[in-house]
Structure formats: C-alpha cells, structure tokens
C-alpha cells in the first residue's frame, strides 16, 4: 500500500499519545509497518512502544553532536514493539526558543536520512496540544500529513480545541492535500458523550471515527510503560484499539471541515445539557448564591 501520513491533534492532556501508541500497536499487530514521530517537547510519544521513560530526541542529539549534520539516523531512530520505528523531535529548554522548530528540524532530518522507507505503510505524527501554530502546524502546512485525526471528549474545552484545530486544517487544506479523517472520542464518561461527539462531527462535516471507552486497564498498562495491546491483548479495551485501527485503515472519508461558530458550539452544548441557556443574571454567581 502507498504510504499514509497521519497527524493526531487534540487538547493537551486528552490522551493523544496514549491513543496514538495503542492505535499504532494495533496496526503493527495486524502486520503494518509504522513509524511514530513525536512532535512534543515532552518526548512521551513513544514511551509505551519502547518501554522507556523518554527517548533521546533529535534536538538533544543534534545539540550534543554539534549540529544536525553530524547525526546519523540510528542515533535518533529506535525500534519498538511490533517493529514500530520511533523518533522524538524534542524541543528547546522551557522558556527558550520555539518548540515547533524541533518538529521542522526532525522531519527535515528524517527525510534527508531516508527514514521514510518504501516498506512503511503509515507514519503517525503525535502533535502537541491544541495550538496549530507555526512549527506544530508543520505536518499540515508542508503537506507531510494528508490525514488529520482529532482526539477529543465530551468536555467543553476538548470540543473547543477540536473546532480550533479544524479551523487550522481549513487554512492549509485549500493550498494542499491535507484533510480531516475524523474525531476520535477518548471518553471522559460525561453524559451522552458519544451522541454529543457524533453531533459535533456532523456539525463540522466529518465523522466520529471511533468511541474509545474509559477503562482502568489503560492506566495499568501505562504504569508498565506498555500499550494495552501488548500488556493485555485479550482485554476488551485492546479490541477497541483494534477496531479504531481497522476503521482508520479503511477510512475513505477525508474532508475539508466546516468549523462551527462559537454560537453553534454553545447551542450544541446547551442541547446536550452540558451548558445552561445563557442567563445574564447568573453570570459570575457562585452555586450557593444561585
């Protein structure tokens, strides 16, 4: 199959890295050749695949080598569970420089060194947070990733973030081939969560590609720095990640999204009881005062 390059975006703390690594493990289990490129200075995008605390990053290795030109591919690329290739872009010290620059440096380095080999089926970019700014937009902006998946939940801020990311996709879609492949709902067990995310997906012109239920086995696996696929392959949650992998494998619905207005989003939240109809008299009042 032709190489498919996918980027996973979503609000910080929503479970992007965990979801991505479990999805990738399921694809590897199904015989697919996959590379993960972590695009987050925290460098935690590959820890469950490699069973490690944090992988050495391209930026760290380039700094210690003197320059990127002195780096070799084997210095930064490690092989983990199921033969998955793992790379972390890394970033500068907190408060110094642009972390997005690490993403640009890493992807350019990987291309120059032949990391995107012909045998690869998928490359997944696990991208920091909900900002689609300069460096972090690189997988979209430079047409590296053709498919974007947004991890969200039924919480208000996760939905706002998903809508903002959709706006970023629109900005670059008209000048390139990037498309939204769908929303992945990583459940927080909020009320009517699956219905709400399906409604949000319909509102912005995409699909909820899969609803991943909340299960403590994910945390049990993470403590051991493992994916659920590897830690407990017979668990129901492992089958959820396999189902997500199959849906992405077979996904043909790649769209330029139509982001919702703030009013539309608030109406949706009111419809599902997440937000009360606006009443100026209660704004800023504590619960006890109401």
Swiss-Prot record:
Alphabetized GO MF terms: 4 iron, 4 sulfur cluster binding; ATP binding; metal ion binding; nitrogenase activity
Keyword Calcium: no
Pfam families per UniProt: Fer4_NifH
Cofactor-binding details, from the entry: Binds 1 [4Fe-4S] cluster per dimer.
PTM statement from Swiss-Prot or TrEMBL: The reversible ADP-ribosylation of Arg-101 inactivates the nitrogenase reductase and regulates nitrogenase activity.
SUPFAM superfamilies: P-loop containing nucleoside triphosphate hydrolases (SSF52540)
InterPro entries cross-referenced by the UniProt entry: NifH/chlL_CS, NifH/frxC, Nitrogenase_Fe_NifH, P-loop_NTPase
Residue(s) carrying ADP-ribosylarginine: 101
PROSITE patterns tied to this protein: NIFH_FRXC_1, NIFH_FRXC_2, NIFH_FRXC_3
Cofactor dependency: [4Fe-4S] cluster
GO biological process: nitrogen fixation
Reactions listed under catalytic activity: N2 + 8 reduced [2Fe-2S]-[ferredoxin] + 16 ATP + 16 H2O = H2 + 8 oxidized [2Fe-2S]-[ferredoxin] + 2 NH4(+) + 16 ADP + 16 phosphate + 6 H(+)
Binding site for [4Fe-4S] cluster: 98, 133
Binding site for ATP: 10-17
Enzyme Commission code(s) on record: 1.18.6.1
UniProt keyword terms in alphabetical order: 4Fe-4S, ADP-ribosylation, ATP-binding, Iron, Iron-sulfur, Metal-binding, Nitrogen fixation, Nucleotide-binding, Oxidoreductase
Further details from the record: This subunit is associated with the vanadium-iron nitrogenase component 2.
Record note on quaternary structure: Homodimer.
Family statement drawn from the similarity comment of this UniProt entry: Belongs to the NifH/BchL/ChlL family.
PANTHER family reported in the protein's UniProt record: LIGHT-INDEPENDENT PROTOCHLOROPHYLLIDE REDUCTASE IRON-SULFUR ATP-BINDING PROTEIN
Biological role stated in the UniProt entry: The key enzymatic reactions in nitrogen fixation are catalyzed by the nitrogenase complex, which has 2 components: the iron protein (component 2) and a component 1 which is either a molybdenum-iron protein, a vanadium-iron, or an iron-iron protein.
The protein's name in its UniProt record: Nitrogenase iron protein 2
Organism of derivation: Azotobacter chroococcum mcd 1
């Amino acid at each position: 199959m032709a190489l498919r390059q996918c980027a996973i975006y979503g609000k910080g703390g929503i479970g992007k890295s965990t979801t991505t690594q479990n999805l990738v493990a399921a694809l590897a289990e199904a015989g697919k050749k996959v590379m993960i490129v972590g695009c987050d200075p925290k460098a935690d995008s590959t820890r469950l695949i490699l069973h490690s605390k944090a992988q050495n990053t391209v930026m760290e290795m380039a700094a210690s080598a003197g320059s990127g030109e002195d780096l070799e591919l084997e210095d930064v690329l490690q092989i983990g569970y199921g033969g998955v290739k793992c790379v972390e872009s890394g970033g500068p010290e907190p408060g110094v420089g642009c972390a997005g620059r690490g993403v640009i440096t890493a992807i350019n380095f990987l291309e120059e060194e032949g990391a995107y080999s012909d045998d690869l089926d998928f490359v997944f970019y696990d991208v920091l947070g909900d900002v689609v700014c300069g460096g972090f937009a690189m997988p979209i902006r430079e047409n590296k990733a053709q498919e974007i998946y947004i991890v969200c939940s039924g919480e208000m801020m996760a939905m706002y973030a998903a809508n903002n990311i959709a706006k970023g996709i629109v900005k670059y879609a008209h000048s390139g081939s990037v498309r939204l492949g769908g929303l992945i709902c990583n459940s927080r067990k909020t009320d009517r969560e699956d219905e709400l995310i399906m409604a949000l997906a319909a509102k912005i012109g995409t699909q909820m590609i899969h609803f991943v239920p909340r299960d403590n086995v994910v945390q049990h696996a993470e403590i051991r720095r493992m994916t659920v696929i590897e830690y407990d392959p017979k668990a129901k949650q492992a089958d959820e990640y396999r189902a997500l992998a199959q849906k992405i494998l077979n996904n043909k619905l790649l769209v330029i999204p139509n982001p919702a207005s703030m009013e539309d989003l608030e109406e949706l939240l009111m419809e599902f009881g997440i937000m009360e109809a606006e009443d100026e008299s209660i704004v800023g009042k504590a619960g006890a005062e109401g």
